[in-house]
């Protein structure tokens, strides 16, 4: 327990060690188990890590002491197993790790171990605070300062830090830098007073070295004093930020120093646990993959931004690189007109300003950069950030910026330095100054109208209340009028439109007469309809383009003209079918006659059925324009078709009688089967006509019975021969 207290003084307190002295074995085991579990819960993300032990707790047949021993062994085994899995993954992936160099000019105070972070939030929800170990990939915020960490624990972390995998290393470092506790107000005031004294001394030295900038340095010193009074009057917010900034530099320099401590690690002992931890790392990488991809391009752009800034202020940086404390003061003591002071904090817990130093992309996204310094007041520039490693330029580094902005409670970040020339052209996600303007569109249409022959006209005044508020000369109307002018010009030059104009002038009188005739036309006689239709077509067929010519005559009844044409075409078609059927010649042979009549019947049958379905609607439309079409022609067509089928049956019976006479005279007929098939075919056609017409007349009914009797009484016919 004393060893655990030395390694983890935040978890295993001294009071617990004293309480165990003189206690019985069961109580000591309980204390020991609780401390082991608290240590494991502080850095192991899996809440069931104890149950992964090979020791299975079973109280069957065991006393209390044995069960306590099993609990302790399970906790130890689970802790060792989880640690071995984590370190095994780190050993195998450490071969591809890049070396890091320690920047010059870092004070000795910066060369120390990382500060521990708490496992839970600042709301004291955690029961077991713990030091940060390599197992923590995404630890929570800190609960204690780094002063409580023992030196032995620092050494242990320094050794374990080098075992981190590249994925864990990036997240581990950024979480440490982002989650720092606020220092006390008294310590911050003392640190700022010392920084002010050193800044004054530094200003005096610069004044002696360079007489050209003496006036500017004096003004800078006076401004620093004013800024200090302003910070003290505004509260502890700015003081806490200055202290955190200084400690952020120290922590980052120590992080880089720890990276170059060890480079050779044996990975053979942990090869079996690699696959298990590899899946865990892949899950973590997948969890942050989207955020990393969103920020990686902007971060690389900002990296070049920082490099350009470092080159621009190289001379001034050399004078300010003696100590990290003086660097922080130089950043905070710049004049107001150069770098605006940070806004007041909204909560006592603030993220470290170091984040803005290493990840200026986050600050650019949260607030606009300050204006460049004026020529009259050139303040000392802040020192450039330490060289950024390739690992810190990855997506996980950028992912921290998103976490920082989310969990920081709207805390301000470090103001970004002024951008060097040409550095902002590649910032993809920066706020653009480009805006859409309706004036450009209006100007375009106005110029287009001017080029098409219309002058530029200003906007009309808004109409008063109750009047039309639409502008008389809007861009759309100007464009339409321009198109009309262009069309008119094309019309004048086109021979086609010239011919149309000639037709208008030539047939104007005939069209006017036709116009009045169509308006007054009404009839019930279909012959009169056909005659009037022919007269109209004889005039209109002479026009080059009927639509274009008639459009020149206002009030021409085009709709009634279309109705007259429809009625005339319909009646003409029905009358043509009727005439064709009446003039149909009934001539032998029967097979050829049936072939022709069946083809024609199938052709007009569908047309007649369509007219019957729509005749009621057509009759209403025709009557609206004083045209009463006679649909009795449909009945005439059906009756005529029945007469044609009756004639076919008579021809079939006639051929049957001739065949019987030949048989009586002793002449054997060689076409008995063919005659039988012709009888059956004539009967089938008669039945189709019966279905189409809806009935038979007396003549057709009598012939159908006779034909059926002949088919039934024919001794030479069989069912198979007829059906074949």
UniProtKB/Swiss-Prot annotation:
Compositionally biased intervals (Basic and acidic residues): 223-252, 309-322
Residue ranges, compositional bias (Acidic residues): 193-212
Keyword Coiled coil: yes
Compositionally biased tracts (Polar residues): 115-128, 400-410
Biased composition (Low complexity): 323-333, 347-366
Listed Pro residues bias regions: 367-388
Superkingdom: Eukaryota
Residue ranges that the Swiss-Prot or TrEMBL entry lists as coiled coil: 187-217, 495-522, 649-678
Keyword list, A-Z: Coiled coil
Stretch list, region Disordered: 97-131, 187-252, 309-434, 454-473
Entries under PANTHER family matching the protein: HYDROXYPROLINE-RICH GLYCOPROTEIN FAMILY PROTEIN, PROTEIN CHUP1, CHLOROPLASTIC
Protein name: Uncharacterized protein At4g04980
């Amino acid at each position: 327990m004393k060893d655990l207290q030395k390694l983890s003084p935040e978890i295993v307190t001294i009071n617990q060690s004293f309480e165990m002295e003189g206690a019985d074995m069961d109580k000591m085991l309980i204390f020991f188990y609780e401390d082991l579990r608290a240590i494991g819960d502080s850095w192991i993300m899996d809440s069931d890590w104890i149950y992964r032990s090979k020791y299975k707790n079973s109280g069957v047949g065991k006393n209390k002491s044995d069960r306590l021993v099993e609990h302790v062994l399970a906790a130890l085994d689970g802790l060792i197993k989880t640690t071995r899995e984590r370190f095994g993954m780190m050993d195998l992936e450490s071969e591809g790790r890049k070396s890091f160099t320690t920047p010059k000019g870092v004070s000795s105070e910066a060369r120390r171990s990382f500060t521990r972070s708490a496992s839970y939030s600042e709301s004291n929800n955690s029961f077991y605070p713990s030091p940060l170990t390599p197992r923590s990939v995404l630890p929570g915020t800190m609960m204690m300062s780094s002063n409580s960490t023992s030196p032995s624990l620092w050494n242990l972390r320094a050794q374990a830090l080098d075992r981190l995998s590249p994925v864990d290393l990036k997240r581990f470092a950024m979480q440490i830098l982002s989650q720092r506790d606020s220092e006390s107000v008294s310590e911050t005031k003392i640190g700022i007073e010392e920084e002010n004294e050193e800044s004054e001394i530094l200003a005096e030295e610069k004044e002696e070295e360079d007489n050209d900038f003496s006036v500017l340095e004096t003004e800078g010193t006076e401004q620093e004093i004013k800024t200090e009074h302003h910070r003290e009057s505004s509260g502890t917010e700015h003081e806490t930020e200055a202290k955190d900034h200084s400690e952020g530099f120290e922590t980052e320099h120590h992080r880089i120093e720890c990276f170059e401590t060890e480079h050779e690690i044996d990975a053979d002992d942990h090869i079996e646990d690699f696959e298990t931890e590899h899946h865990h790392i892949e899950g973590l990488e997948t969890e942050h993959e989207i955020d990393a991809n969103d920020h990686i391009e902007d971060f690389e752009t900002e990296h070049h931004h920082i490099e350009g800034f470092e080159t621009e202020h190289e001379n001034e940086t050399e004078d300010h690189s003696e100590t990290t404390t003086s660097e922080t003061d130089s950043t905070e003591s710049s004049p107001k007109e150069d770098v605006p002071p940070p806004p007041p904090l909204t909560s006592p817990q603030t993220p470290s300003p170091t984040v803005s130093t290493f990840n200026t992309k986050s600050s650019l996204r949260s607030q606009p950069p300050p204006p460049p310094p004026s020529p009259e007041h050139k303040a000392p520039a802040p020192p450039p950030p330490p060289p950024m490693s390739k690992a810190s330029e990855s997506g996980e580094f950028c992912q921290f910026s998103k976490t920082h902005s989310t969990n920081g409670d709207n805390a301000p970040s470090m103001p970004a330095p002024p951008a060097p020339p040409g550095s902002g052209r590649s910032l993809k996600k920066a706020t653009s100054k480009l805006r859409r303007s309706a004036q450009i569109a209006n100007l375009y249409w106005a110029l287009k109208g001017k080029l098409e022959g219309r002058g530029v006209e200003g906007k009309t005044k808004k109409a008063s209340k109750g009047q039309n508020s639409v502008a008389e000369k809007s861009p759309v109307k100007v464009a339409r009028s321009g198109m009309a002018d262009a069309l008119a010009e094309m019309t004048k030059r086109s021979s086609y439109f010239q011919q149309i104009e000639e037709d208008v002038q030539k047939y104007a009188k005939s069209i006017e007469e036709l116009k009045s005739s169509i308006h007054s036309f009404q009839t019930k006689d279909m012959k009169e309809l056909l005659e009037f239709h022919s007269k109209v077509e004889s005039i209109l067929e002479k026009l080059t383009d009927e639509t274009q010519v008639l459009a020149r005559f206002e009030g021409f009844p085009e709709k009634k003209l279309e109705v007259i044409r429809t009625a005339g075409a319909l009646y003409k078609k029905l009358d043509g079918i009727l005439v064709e059927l009446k003039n149909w010649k009934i001539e032998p042979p029967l097979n050829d006659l049936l072939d022709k009549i069946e083809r024609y019947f199938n052709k007009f049958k569908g047309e007649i059925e369509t007219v019957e379905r729509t005749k009621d609607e057509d009759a209403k439309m025709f009557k609206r324009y004083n045209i009463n079409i006679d649909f009795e022609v449909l009945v005439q067509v059906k009756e005529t078709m029945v007469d044609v089928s009756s004639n076919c049956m008579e021809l079939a019976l006639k051929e049957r009688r001739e065949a019987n006479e030949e048989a009586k005279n002793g002449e054997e007929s060689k076409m008995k089967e063919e005659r039988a098939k012709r009888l059956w075919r004539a009967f089938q056609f008669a039945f189709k006509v019966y279905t189409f017409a809806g009935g038979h007349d007396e003549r057709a009914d009598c012939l159908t019975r006779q034909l059926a009797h002949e088919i039934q009484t024919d001794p030479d016919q069989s069912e198979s021969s007829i059906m074949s």
